[in-house]
A protein has these predicted regions:
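Short helix-to-turn junction characteristic of helix-turn-helix DNA-binding domains
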Residues: 12, 43-47
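Short alpha-helical "packing" element that flanks the helix-turn-helix/winged-helix DNA-binding module
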Residues: 36-40
Length: 139
C-alpha cells in the first residue's frame, strides 16, 4: 500500500467530503448547507449562546465560527447581539425566520439521515458515529 492510501487523515477527509456533499445536496432546496443546519439546530436546542460556546459545541475555532455565522446573519436566520453581562462577548440567537428555516431543513435532514442509514446499514451508521465520537488523536 502507498502511504497516501494508509493515511487516516486523508481517508477521513475524503469520507467527510463525500458525506458533506451528500447532505448539502439534500438540504439544497432550503438554501442551507449542512454546516449551517448544524448551527441552527444547535441554537434551536440551546437558545441564545455566546460565539465561543457555540464554537466549542461544534469543535470549531472562534474565527471559523464567525465566518460560518455571517451568511446566517445576512439571511436573518440568526441575530448577533452584545452580551448584557459582558460587552466584549456576542450572543447568538435564532430568529423566527431562522426557526422556520430550521423546521424546513430538519425534514430534509431526517430524509438524508434515513437514506444514508439505508445505504450503509443502521448498525454501520451507529458504529461510525460511535467510533468518531470516541476517536483519540495523539496521546
Amino acid at each position: 500500500m502507498k502511504p497516501f492510501e494508509q493515511c487516516n487523515c486523508m481517508a477521513l477527509r475524503r469520507a467527510s467530503r463525500r458525506i458533506t456533499n451528500f447532505y448539502d445536496s439534500k438540504l439544497a432546496p432550503t438554501g442551507l448547507r449542512v454546516t449551517q443546519y448544524a448551527i441552527l439546530a444547535l441554537l434551536g436546542k440551546l437558545g441564545g449562546v455566546s460565539v465561543n460556546s457555540l464554537a466549542r459545541h461544534l469543535d470549531l475555532d472562534r474565527t471559523t465560527m464567525g465566518k460560518n455565522l455571517r451568511p446566517l446573519e445576512r439571511m436573518r436566520y440568526v441575530k448577533v447581539t452584545s452580551s448584557p453581562t459582558d460587552g466584549r462577548s456576542r450572543t447568538i440567537t435564532l430568529t423566527n425566520s431562522g426557526g422556520a428555516a430550521l423546521k424546513a431543513a430538519a425534514r430534509l435532514w431526517r430524509r438524508a439521515q434515513a437514506e444514508f442509514e439505508s445505504a450503509n446499514g443502521g448498525a454501520v451508521a451507529r458504529a461510525l458515529r460511535s467510533t468518531l465520537a470516541n476517536l483519540k488523536v495523539g496521546r
